[in-house]
Amino acid sequence: QHVTPANAVLAISGDVSEKTIRETIDGLFKGWKGPLNALGKDSVIAKKRDVAVDRDMMQNHLIFGFLGPGLIDDDRYAVEVLDSILSGMGGRIHKVLREENPYAYALTFFNQMAFDVGGMGIYIGTDRKLVKEVNRIAKSEIQKIVKEGFSDEEVKNAKNYLLGNHYISMQSNGAIAMSMCLDAMYGMKPGFFKVWPKHIEKVTLNDVNRVARKYLDLEKMVSVNVGGKD
């Protein structure tokens, strides 16, 4: 159903002959036919939800999730910078819950993008006795981020980190081929990995503060608590 030529992408990176590659591919896959399966529309949650899963565990696992932009959304670049600011060890929430208060044994900000929609948020691992306090602090910090925004230095450092990691990750032919393949499958051009840095470079402080206000909405947050009850 899904493994069809209409759904397949072949990406090749390296010192190769186009003529030889075409002849080889024609010989291997000639006659392989099948129907086209279009990308489906993802369902989204646009209202506040609180979910608790009672488990007998030593620690509780908390997630504060928000709707985010997809791969084809122009907001994705500013959100990627936002993610870089908040996910590092120097991030504001990490500082409050790990450095100033030893409340979280694990903490990270995440950003997962699908085709036309994404999800982002905060994961926190903590003691069950601290769940209420961690909830309060996390929500308070989110409100501060939305209200006060970030600094030029935070945005500059986050952009440099993203760009540096990108150039390092694209040093092998295998990585380039994989990027070309996935980008083509998502409806973007195979050379997207070359233009992505330009999009990141254009992100401004105002862009990052704007997407923080747009997406980090506590009234549309999905809160999940997996673990025991105090």
Predicted regions and their residues:
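Carbohydrate-associated surface elements
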Residues: 15
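Extracytoplasmic/secreted cell-surface and envelope-processing proteins
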Residues: 18-22
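Short, Lys/Arg-rich flexible segments
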Residues: 147
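Non-catalytic beta-strand/loop surface segments
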Residues: 1-6, 27, 31-73, 84-136, ...
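Surface-exposed aromatic
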Residues: 192-195
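C-terminal hydrophobic structural anchor segments
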Residues: 156-187
